[in-house]
Amino acid sequence: QRQMCIRDRAYDIPTMLSEATGVLKSLIAIPSLSRDEEKAADYLQNYIELQGMATGRKGNNIWCLSPMFDLNKPTLLLNSHIDTVKAVNGWRKDPFTPTQESNGKLYGLGSNDAGASVVSLLQVFLQLCRTTQKYNLIYLASCEEEVSGKGGIECVLPELPPIHFAIVGEPTEMQPAIAEKGLMVLDVTAYGKAGHAARNEGDNAIYKVLEDIAWFRDYRFEKVSPLLGPVKMSVTQINAGTQHNVIPDRCTFVVDIRSNECYSNQELFTEIQKHISCEAKARSFRLSSSHVAEQHPIVQRAVAMGRVPFGSPTLSDQALMSFPSLKMGPGKSSRSHTADEFIFIQEIEEAIGLYLELLDGATIDI
């Protein structure tokens, strides 16, 4: 239990930790599956307003601007998400009962992904709002992140003042992810002609996809990212046929494509279409790979603090941001979407201290 001095400013970390932990326990107890986050948003909005801050709301997204907001200064966004996935099978505890053990482990659905980030960033925001910085702050607790929903951060960003940099809270063990893989899902269809399997009839649609599936398995895009590695393509679903004795006239398969920052999703799609004969449709081009330069002053500060920049294979709301961002938060990615999800209270304490050290006195480029 200690006070922490950053650039001659004393921060009461124990009080901030106590507040953060209390809010997290309350959030765990409120089910907030993607697209059903209303009660969690209500709670968080009420909590922020009780701290004397005005809030904005659109759907189940809650945000708050620092006092004395000055459009001549750059603006820093602190963002994490309040929605969770459904509880997977295998939970031995009630996912919606926050259970804290003597070793400081706090169990609950969304504790790690991304409740700990939501509450750590909120306490840091409230503290920094009481100080003078060279930037404005916006705190945003967004919804629908786990489903990349249209009602999440994407619909809020146009309502906010221009943002110049973002910290996105996701479990990274407080290491800074300076690049993140994007996602594009393709639905691919081949058409044939139905016929009876016993006779030499029809045109088998399954045979038509074989070459294309082999191409997806074997093709390597030329540009490899030093942080994210190559573009990864995986055929993950296939569907054809109605019964054993009918030649299928249609075969569809799904391709999961994880992009690196060397290509836009549109560029990948254009290249793919040159090589395959089946009809391909992209579900969306919007979940792009993201990348921030290692020379960015915030990244440089993180490195000076002993943090190690890395490339993240998992998708977050960073994909929907048009400005530079850093993904960094308490907890471990490997605990997300697992039974008996947990966070250590000590990880929240560490996160609050590291966020303050990173952001108090920071410079953000316009």
Kindly give the residue locations of the regions a language model identified.
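Active-site metal-coordination/substrate-binding segment of hydrolases
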Residues: 73-138
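Hydrophobic/aromatic beta-strand patches that form the interior of the parallel beta-sheet core
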Residues: 76-78, 140, 165-167, 326-328
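Buried hydrophobic packing segments
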Residues: 44, 118-128, 156, 209-212, ...
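Acidic/histidine-rich catalytic neighborhood of metal-dependent amide-processing enzymes
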Residues: 114-185, 189, 366
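N-terminal helical capping/dimerization or prosegment-like subdomains
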Residues: 7-87, 250-254, 268-271, 345-349, ...
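Short glycine/proline-enriched coil/turn segments at helix->beta-strand junctions
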Residues: 49-54, 58-60, 72-73, 128-134, ...
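Metal-dependent amide/peptide-bond hydrolase catalytic core
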Residues: 7, 15, 178, 185-366
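Short, small-residue-biased leader/transition segments that mark boundaries at the very start
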Residues: 1-6
